[in-house]
Amino acid sequence: MGDKRYIRDALHGDLILPDDVRKIVDTRSFQRLRYIQQLATCHYAFPSATHTRFSHSLGVFHLATRLVEDLRERFPGKISDEDARLVPIAALLHDIGHPPFSHMFETPEVFATFAGHEEWGKRILLDEECDLSSVLKELLGESGVERLIAIMEGNGVAPFLHEIISSQLDVDRFDYLLRDQLITGTDVGGFDLERLLRAINISEDGRLVVSIYSISAVEAYLVTRWHMYQLVYFHKLNMLTSVYYVRALVRARELHESGSLPLSLKMRDMLSNRDLTPYRYSQLTDSFVIADVFQWADHDDPVLSGYARRLSSRDGFHKRLRIELNHQQVEEVREPLMELIEQAGFDPVHDLIHAPLRKEGYLPYQEGIHLEDGRDIMEASPLIESISVEFSRSMVFVPLEVREQCEELVNSFLK
């Protein structure tokens, strides 16, 4: 295979990149992932959480390579030489289509040309303007690229090939859970990666299954995922600053359309270009967003500068109501809260912030994790059954000056 490159990784140690993979990694399309943070605004709560989609993608490639090699040894003939090469590359490229700030900006509120990151990834792989497309064609040929996309999408291939990189027990989740836990310093849960990798088998119908003797390893993995959502991904500062960023960009678009705010070319591409090409999309990173938002802190518009000032200097952060609310309860108290906030001299629209939280728990049956005997793992684990319910609640933020009055009002409605 020629020369190899060794990369030292904080989570996995030495990662080995074969020569063909190195050529993919060295493209501009892939190097862009160095400038997209894995956890968006989590660094406001966890200062060390500035790791990127680049390091995560290399880690997923590493785990996919390990798992494929192990499965080939234990299940001879199940994975062809071509697929053994393509599955790790598919894992490497699984996040190639992420927008700036990852999932946070993956919304039509921000992008005038909206598509999910999986769709943008496919467009980048196929667009002749993108250097990654030409490198893949050179290395894999057109049929190889078609097979690569089929594996990434799970179309026309053995299910387990896709499940290695996208399922409820995939190498993507293995890497980001352990990496995010390590780098945020969140000492909770944890799972035995080595045991989990060894527990994965291939069923007769071509699905990934786990040994009944490894249920405890899967339990630890799923419980860790549950804790990470509670403590990190749904942290109140992460949720609040995410809203600040999205609202700042929405306001910037409004001001631009009214002629009162010039936008940089890349910001126009994101907010106003309804015919955004994959090549132009693949030039968007966190860096230009941060630079523009910091400039807006001095703008004359109080709404735009208010959001930008909070993000750039942490001045005047809104405070969370110390009451557990569901979405329906928030809607019931919204108008009274807006009236109270307005009477206190604040903006009832921009100073009442609702951050809904919703995350599906473990999904059983067709999408679930199956044992070798065909049962869903939930049937053999009361613990997994207990975390299969959907998590849904709301965070409400208001100015500090009126938080206590708002809490009194909400409590009066909930009686």
Question: Predicted segment positions?
Answer:
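Histidine-centered, transition-metal-coordinating active-site segments
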Residues: 1-86, 96-415
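Aromatic-lined, polymer-binding surfaces characteristic
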Residues: 93
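Alpha-helical scaffold segments that flank or form the walls of functional sites
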Residues: 89-90
